[in-house]
């Protein structure tokens, strides 16, 4: 497998994780209360 392809996939994964971070933070906050 091409290392560049792996990097692209990792970057894409990080972007989607960051996108979901907002929702995760809200969920964690509501659970913590």
Swiss-Prot record:
The keyword rRNA processing does not apply. Keywords: Disulfide bond, Secreted, Toxin. GO terms for cellular component: extracellular region. It is found in: Secreted. One of its GO terms (molecular function) is toxin activity. It comes from the Eukaryota. Heterodimer composed of subunit A and subunit B (DELTA-PSDTX-Pp1a); disulfide-linked. Electrospray ionization experiments give a mass of 6598.6 Da for DELTA-pseudomyrmecitoxin-Pp1a heterodimer (subunits A+B). This is DELTA-pseudomyrmecitoxin-Pp1a subunit B. It comes from Pseudomyrmex penetrator (Ant).
């Amino acid at each position: 497998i091409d290392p560049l392809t792996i990097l692209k996939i990792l970057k894409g994964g990080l972007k989607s994780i960051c996108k979901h971070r907002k929702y995760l933070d809200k969920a964690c906050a509501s659970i913590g209360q």
